[in-house]
Amino acid sequence: MTSRRQFRRSVLFAGALALAAFSTSPARADRCDDVAKQLATQIDGVKVNFKARNIVYLTHPATKEFSIGCRGQNYSLELFAKTDRKYKPEFLALVANAGALVFTIPKPDVVTGSTRCMKRMGILRGDKVSMRFRRLNMECTRTKTEASIAVTRGKDE
């Protein structure tokens, strides 16, 4: 009789553990998804395209590529945008709006930093410019046909 009770008790205990392990927990949205949805609702023309691993790809008429990266090896958030070599003011406005929302800093700071980075590319400084402005790392790159900007914030900030 004692062995039967011990067996029943152990089976009930194992069943309770299995139920606790496989019970459904509420789905938690990633911060990256939240930021992408916020961008889509607050900036005209931005649409969430798809998510691949830790990158959310977005679309906008002023860009060729537009994405938000979350939790890389050296950064906590990344905003990447690519356009034609001769970028338009709408492109810088989009980067400024998105940067202000993603990194929660004032929009004029992002406008100043991204404009400086894009304007520094040229004969004197080359086609790849890296700079730091208001705790944001900005890297501007251009090729013969495209110009891009990657704005990141380090993990420790």
Where would I find each of the regions flagged by the language model?
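Bacterial N-terminal signal peptides
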Residues: F13-A21
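Sec/Tat signal peptide C-region and signal peptidase I cleavage site
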Residues: T24-A29
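N-terminal secretory signal peptides
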Residues: D30-N74
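Extracellular/mature segments of secreted proteins
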Residues: Q38-I43, S76-A81, L124-D127, A147-V151
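Short Gly/Thr-rich strand-loop-strand
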Residues: V46-Y57, K107-N137
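Long, charged/polar, surface-exposed segments that mediate recognition or autoinhibition
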Residues: C70-M121
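Short, exposed beta-strand-loop hairpins at the edges of beta-sheets
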Residues: K128-K155
